[in-house]
Amino acid sequence: ASEIVLKIVGDNEFGLLSTISNVIKDLHINILNANFETKESRFVGKLVLQVGNTNLLEQLLRKLKSLKGVSEVQRIS
């Protein structure tokens, strides 16, 4: 398993953080660290995750990008 860092940007909508967390949980990916900041109607999140393989990472990125309210998902390391 490797440690990766994701940046997520989106609308500050009620329940969206919970939805993001559930997507990660459903893929059995471990959250090592999470930091979310809101500014007006937007949020920026930085997640440190432990991901088993590249296939899983690709699934995660695809699912997060498809969420309503999420405008950007980017691997930063």
Across the structure, where does each feature detected by a protein language model lie?
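A conserved regulatory-domain signal marking ACT and ACT-like small-molecule sensing domains
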Residues: A1-S77
